[in-house]
């Protein structure tokens, strides 16, 4: 008598996905992305002009790397969340969890940019319409 292993059917193939709407494909910047990009552009311009305030701001931002945004109140005015809050419609008050997530994302983005920018003052480390982080990592 021979034993045969039970036949396991192959996994079902997922149905073909419908194309994403053009608004999703376009990678339209949301209010958080716009706020962070504007803050970084301002800091970057000032840093390249050797503004003492920008040099100090980048030094402070670098100290925030690896720390939670809630642990670094000295950075709260440097990250650029003010523009994000101003862009929120009056009839939409984001949940506390959404706000915390946005603050954390902005904190990580700006502090890591500050570290990266320090490596080469003459070169702009943040470029508009440049490769996304995922694209850059794949290269």
Regions found by a protein language model. Give the residues of each.
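Aromatic- and glycine-enriched beta-alpha-beta binding-site module
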Residues: 87-136
């Amino acid at each position: 008598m021979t034993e045969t292993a039970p036949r396991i059917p192959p996994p079902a193939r997922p149905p073909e996905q419908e194309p994403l709407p053009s608004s999703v494909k376009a990678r339209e910047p949301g209010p958080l992305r716009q706020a962070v990009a504007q803050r970084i552009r301002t800091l970057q311009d000032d840093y390249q002009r050797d503004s003492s305030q920008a040099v100090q701001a980048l030094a402070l931002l670098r100290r925030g790397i690896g720390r939670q945004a809630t642990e670094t109140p000295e950075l709260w005015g440097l990250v650029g969340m003010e523009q994000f809050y101003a862009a929120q419609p009056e009839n939409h008050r984001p949940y506390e969890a959404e706000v915390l997530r946005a603050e954390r994302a902005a904190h990580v983005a700006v502090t890591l940019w500050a570290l990266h920018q320090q490596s080469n003052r003459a070169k702009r480390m943040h470029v508009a319409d440049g490769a996304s982080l995922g694209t850059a990592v794949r290269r």
